[in-house]
């Protein structure tokens, strides 16, 4: 005798096979309503709401309960496709403990270009040792247990989320004839972003995929560029759930380093596209998480290596430093700094190092210093090569410095400090 429940509410297929309606049955979201069955024929009726009815075909009256059994029926394979952004649940249910000699399985399938995330919401099985010889949950890649085993679990310590390498997963729950516990509950969902990725190179893109990200997402990206360079993030699109400035629901976090223990540069949500964000070193770490409720189109981020100096810098403190970074500056840069100190004060420049491409009139690469707030002010000097005054003074409380390079030779660059006089 066999009952088949087919649930096609989320964007992948979920199938359960069972002959014990108390212990191996689908949880809510979607809810399965068991109307009882006889040994004749079962018709599965799909609803557009969150309820799926398994309707028995009987000859008058309510069907009698099935005879008691302790194992699930043989596996089968069905496919269903629906909209994204939802999660489902399965496992042992009921108010008591699971039975001895259970043998239940579930096959879960996502669309061809997606992967699955399995999350243990609870786990309480008999524990013997780390090999789980008694009661256990086995999880495999693929549609059956011939696929790569991703893990075998027992006891009470739930593992980290399990991510499939393909678009399907196979889960088997098996118990022996002795001790019983309270079972387990698994949540499954589509991985809409790329889970954990380390990205190398000087440019590229990453972000969520599809028309909307899913619930319960936990994704991260580590971006690493060559030594001496920095990472710049440019947001091509951005739309997450928003509630307030603290982003309590769905959020994107950006860290100035190689992991989430680095300095946090920002927590982002809502639909206002953020400004470009730059790292101070060669790595940046980005995490995205979503909750159980609303989903939105997500984000797409372009990363690149910026010019070795800041594109625009306004320096307003009484002292500071600025210049190129790395072993050599980049070609085709145009960078500038505006220094403004207190009224009735002057800017004092101190040249610590200076080495840029040389040309008689500094037509290739050059550093130009202006006696005012912008490049329309009178020019104090235009410099290249390795020759420059080691000390310069403004005529007022502002000074503007512009660095420009062409497309050919590169040099170590410069580093300048300023104080107030």
UniProtKB/Swiss-Prot annotation:
Keyword presence, Transport: no
One BP term from GO: chitin localization
All residue ranges annotated as the CUB domain in the record: 72-191, 193-306, 309-421
PROSITE patterns membership: CUB
Signal peptide boundaries: 1-24
Keywords tagged on the record: Disulfide bond, Repeat, Signal
Matching Pfam families: CUB
Disulfide bonds listed in the record: 72-104, 132-154, 193-219, 247-269, 309-335, 362-384
Function: May play a role in protein-protein interactions during tube assembly.
Protein name: Exoskeleton protein RP43
Organism, scientific name: Riftia pachyptila (Vent tube worm)
């Amino acid at each position: 005798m066999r009952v088949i429940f087919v649930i096609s509410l989320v964007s992948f297929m979920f199938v359960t096979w069972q002959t014990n309606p108390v212990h191996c049955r689908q949880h809510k979201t979607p809810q399965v309503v068991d109307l009882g069955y006889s040994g004749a024929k079962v018709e599965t009726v799909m609803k557009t709401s969150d309820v799926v009815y398994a309707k028995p075909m009987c000859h008058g009256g309510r069907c009698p309960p099935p005879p008691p059994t302790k194992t699930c029926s043989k596996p089968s394979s069905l496919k269903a496709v629906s909209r994204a952004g939802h999660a489902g649940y399965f496992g042992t249910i009921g108010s008591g403990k699971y039975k001895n000699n259970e043998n239940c399985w579930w096959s879960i399938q996502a669309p061809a270009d997606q992967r699955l995330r399995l999350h243990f919401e609870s786990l309480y099985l008999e524990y013997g040792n780390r090999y789980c010889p008694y009661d256990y949950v086995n999880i495999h890649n693929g549609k059956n247990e011939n696929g790569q085993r991703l893990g075998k679990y027992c006891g009470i310590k739930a593992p980290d989320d399990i991510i499939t390498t393909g678009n399907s997963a196979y889960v088997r729950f098996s118990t022996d004839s002795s001790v019983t516990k309270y079972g387990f509950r698994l949540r499954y969902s589509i991985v809409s972003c790329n889970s954990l990725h380390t990205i190398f190179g000087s440019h590229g893109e990453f972000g969520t995929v599809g028309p909307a990200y899913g619930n319960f997402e936990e994704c991260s990206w580590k971006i690493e560029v060559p030594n001496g360079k920095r990472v710049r993030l440019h947001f091509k699109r951005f739309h997450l759930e928003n509630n307030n400035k603290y982003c309590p629901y769905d959020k994107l976090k950006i860290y100035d380093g190689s992991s989430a223990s680095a300095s946090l540069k920002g927590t982002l949500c809502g639909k206002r596209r953020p400004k470009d964000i730059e790292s101070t070193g060669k790595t940046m770490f980005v995490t995205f998480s979503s909750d159980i409720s609303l989903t939105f189109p997500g984000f797409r981020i372009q990363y690149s290596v910026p010019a070795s100096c800041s594109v625009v810098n306004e320096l307003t403190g009484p002292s500071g430093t600025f210049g190129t970074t790395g072993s050599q500056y980049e070609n085709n840069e145009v960078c500038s700094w505006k220094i403004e100190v207190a009224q009735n004060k002057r800017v004092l420049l101190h040249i610590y190092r200076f080495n840029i491409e040389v040309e008689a009139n500094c037509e290739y690469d050059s550093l130009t210093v202006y006696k005012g707030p912008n490049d329309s002010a009178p020019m104090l000097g235009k410099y290249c090569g390795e020759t420059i005054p080691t000390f310069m003074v403004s005529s007022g409380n502002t000074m503007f410095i512009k660095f420009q390079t062409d497309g050919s030779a590169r040099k170590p660059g410069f580093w300048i400090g300023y104080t107030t006089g």
